């Protein structure tokens, strides 16, 4: 298996969303899993369609199919269901790991005090 592609368990989760059968009007369809691997490659690399490796299929066919799936709402439906099923309990952003630029230390303070102007009225009342 290619490290850029879907794992077997990932493919099984999204297999039901993939339209089409095994044979199209003009012959055998392109492998759906290979097509999704091509989309993942595009998302990860940020490359152009023409840069798609040949092992993932003809870039013109992948591009056409991508726009067909967008029009049919296949990818929207797939992402909506996967987002609902996502286990985000483990997800946490820890600011001790994230480094900020030295000039990103904070906003400038207003003259005459440490509190933002919008909070001054709240403290007085």
Swiss-Prot record:
Q: Which UniProt keywords apply?
A: Plasmid, Transposable element, Transposition
Task: Extract the InterPro entries matched here.
Answer: IS402-like_dom, Transposase_6_like
Name of this protein: Uncharacterized protein y4sN
- Indicate yes or no for the key word ATP-binding: no
Q: Which organism is it from?
A: Sinorhizobium fredii (strain NBRC 101917 / NGR234)
**Lineage, top ranks:** Bacteria, Pseudomonadati, Pseudomonadota, Alphaproteobacteria, Hyphomicrobiales
Which Pfam families does the record associate with it?
A: DUF4096 (PF13340)
Q: Which GO biological process categories is it annotated with?
A: transposition
Q: Which family does it belong to?
A: To transposase of insertion sequence IS6501.
Can you tell which superkingdom this protein's organism belongs to? Answer: Bacteria
């Amino acid at each position: 298996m290619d490290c850029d592609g879907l794992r077997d368990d990932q493919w099984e989760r999204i297999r039901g969303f993939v339209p089409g059968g095994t044979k199209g009007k003009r012959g055998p369809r392109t492998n759906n899993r290979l097509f999704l691997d091509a989309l993942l490659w595009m998302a990860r690399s940020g490359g152009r369609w023409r840069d798609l490796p040949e092992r993932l299929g003809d870039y013109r066919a992948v591009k056409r199919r991508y726009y067909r799936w967008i029009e049919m709402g296949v990818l929207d439906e797939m992402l909506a269901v996967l987002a609902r099923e996502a286990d985000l309990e483990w997800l946490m952003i820890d600011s001790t790991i994230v480094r900020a630029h030295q000039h990103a230390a904070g906003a400038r303070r207003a003259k005459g005090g440490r509190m933002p102007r919008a909070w001054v009225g709240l403290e007085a009342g």
